[in-house]
Amino acid sequence: QLNSTERLQRSYITGIDQIVVDIEAKVDQAFLDEFQLRRGMSQVIDSDITNALYDRLKLDNMIDYEFAGGTVGNTMHNYSTLADDRSVLLGVMSENIKIGSYAYRFLCNTSSRVDLDYLQPVDGPIGRCFTLIDETGERTFAISAGLMNHLRPESIDQELIENSSALVISAYLMRTQGDETMTEATMQAVKYANDAGVPVVLTLGTKFLIEQDPTWWADFVKEHVDILAMNEEEGLAITGFEDPLLAADKALDWTDLVICTAGEKGLFMAGYVDDSFKRETEYPLLPGAIADFNRYEFSRAMRKDDCQNPIRAYSHTAPFMGGPDSIKNTNGAGDCALAAVLHDLSANVYHKLNVANSAKHQQPAMTYSSLAQISKYANRASYEVLVQHSPRLSRGLPEREDCLEQVYWDQ
């Protein structure tokens, strides 16, 4: 029972990111050649090329969109939009911000529910990521780091991490070099989270990074990560399995909960549940690489260590409404799916904080809802990003869906 005399305790999510602004433009091959950019690849460019590239795009009026980016930044924004609640973003921010600058653009495009008070000030620019799209739709990425990788370990607030519902990091944070301190800062936060039993959520971000050393990433996940988010390409890179269900299953060897977005195939989730808490689905059993894999999808996911007799549970949701008629943007769909999963995880922590004696918490579950419910929610949230241009939601989901009412289809 809820104690109404006391003030409700709040739960929140913390994320670490390279603070970056996404700049999108349409270009041709000659433009890529001029700036020595390899088509279809992601490459880091120095500040001179960055400034020349940006000036050229501005001069020729080629920029289509300029908005706040970053995998974890997008996830925090979307979490706060869906949950209408606080998240905390850690990273760097330019100390002096001019109106109209990239840093200004980042602040403007981030939900007011995202707490930016813990950002570390730096004397210089934040990151810029150019997405250059040619006439065939192929995307070429050019990244200018600025000072985005200069988050210091001492800027990580231990108490903030220890009281979080989850800590969200991305694989990009491990790609620092020279005098950049982002990797050390991230590992400091991960250590605080691991020691305090706070779930660490890793989003893989790009297959190219994982392909360089899949064994290292598998070991990292095994040692530090509780929830893994990936798409089918990243799943193939880290597990060696092309089938998203088998990739998610393999990842369960190392972690407790897996989210795998698989484009037009929809979304797969895999997790553990104790045999005594398993719940059979009421939906038809699905065929696949694992026969009847969704049998226990009505179960709530648990950490493997909390299970006396762990069994694996899987769920799959096909694209909402069959997928959008036209996909405006695939960038950020996975981030939005993860934000929905985090919303459910945080709701569970919130309920536990305020209604600790609820029968709901006799099962030490990680999530409030079943795998099937979360999979549907994550799938629905990612659809919202696919039909708009920005990877960031501008509003939460509707309370009721017209398309779920029979009358909608009778029209």
List each model region and its residues.
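Short, threonine-centered small-residue motifs that mark membrane-proximal processing/anchoring sites
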Residues: 328-331
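Glycine-/proline-rich flexible loop or hinge segments
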Residues: 52-63, 82-90
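Ribokinase/PfkB-type carbohydrate-kinase core domain
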Residues: 1-42, 63-67, 71, 86, ...
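The catalytic Tyr-X3-Lys active-site helix of short-chain dehydrogenase/reductase
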Residues: 333, 337, 374, 378
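Active-site gating loops and adjacent loop-to-helix segments of metal-dependent hydrolytic enzymes
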Residues: 35-59
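Active-site alpha-helical elements of protease catalytic centers
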Residues: 66-88, 335-339
